[in-house]
């Protein structure tokens, strides 16, 4: 869990950028919490057979994980604009493609009512180890997917911290 935003509150160049940083940290921490919950949910599964309550909990934890990751990427983009830092803009331009899977997965789940069609019905959300599938698309939910987000946040903090 991160607790850096308040320590560097004088570093962002605008009030909006500071609030974006604070909110970004909240969603990064939310993703960490959700990832930990997903791991606990997976460990609690009894093996073959379906415990519907545990599966529902796991599915909803995965959904909120994608929401947190997607919201964090939106806030990172917003922070790069409101802070007017070329370093942050370049960082965002470099990292933006890495966040597309989070956005795509979140879109599927947030707009599930539009996915209730023949082509999706065979896969409205399944789990294969550390891969969540939806409509035949595969989305990584392993530790490396979380690392994309935490590394991005740490790079933002380092850029801001390096300012005089």
Residue ranges of each PLM-predicted region?
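Amphipathic alpha-helical interface segments
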Residues: 1-98, 128-164
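Histidine-centered, metal-coordinating catalytic motifs and their short helical/loop contexts
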Residues: 96-119
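Surface-exposed beta-strand edges and their flanking turn/coil or helix-capping segments
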Residues: 106, 124, 154-156
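Interfacial non-cytosolic loop connecting adjacent transmembrane helices
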Residues: 118-124, 129-131
């Amino acid at each position: 869990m991160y607790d850096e935003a308040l320590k560097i509150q004088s570093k962002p160049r605008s009030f909006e950028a500071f609030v974006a940083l604070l909110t970004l940290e909240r969603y990064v921490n939310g993703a960490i919490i959700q990832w930990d919950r997903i791991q606990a949910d997976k460990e609690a599964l009894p093996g073959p057979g379906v415990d519907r309550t545990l599966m529902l909990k796991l599915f909803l934890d995965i959904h909120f994980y994608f929401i947190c990751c997607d919201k964090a990427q939106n806030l990172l983009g917003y922070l790069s604009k409101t802070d007017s830092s070329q370093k942050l803009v370049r960082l965002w331009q470099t990292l933006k493609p890495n966040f597309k899977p989070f956005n795509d997965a979140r879109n599927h789940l947030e707009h599930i009512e539009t996915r209730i069609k023949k082509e999706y019905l065979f896969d409205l959300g399944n789990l294969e180890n550390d891969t969540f599938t939806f409509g035949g698309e595969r989305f990584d939910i392993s530790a490396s997917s979380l690392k994309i987000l935490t590394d991005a946040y740490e790079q933002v903090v380092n850029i801001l911290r390096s300012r005089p």
